[in-house]
Amino acid sequence: MKVDGRSPWHLWAVGLIALLWNGFGCFDYTMTQTRREDWFAQMGMTAAQLEYFNAMPSWTHAAWAIGVWGGALGAVLLLMRRKWALHVFVVSFLGWLAGAVYAFALSDGMEAMGSMWPMQVVIGAACLFFIWYAWTMSKTGVLR
């Protein structure tokens, strides 16, 4: 890709999608951490899911925070065309990965999540896509 100082159109599209995606994650994190009962009801969480969530160790909540807030920061850095976007997206992925390991290997998270467990796979795939995209833009000289 020839870099002429302007951002390619897809950088803005991917950056905006990343910001919206991770922005929702930040909103969900905030609403969940502040124990908004109306949010739990709106999300359709069952009593068993709330019990599972309330029993999660604090390190999983920290990993979740790193995942969502790191993803939002990565999106902003991507829109600013900064190479640090790649590193921040990797840290965000590691936050997601820590939570996924707990949910799928160290607890009965898959059972507790019910039909929502595939969403974790979608989130992980989105993280990997944003890493790949930032890496590609970095290698082609779009990110500085």
Region roles according to the model:
Residues 1-144:
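Topology signature of small-to-medium multi-pass alpha-helical membrane proteins
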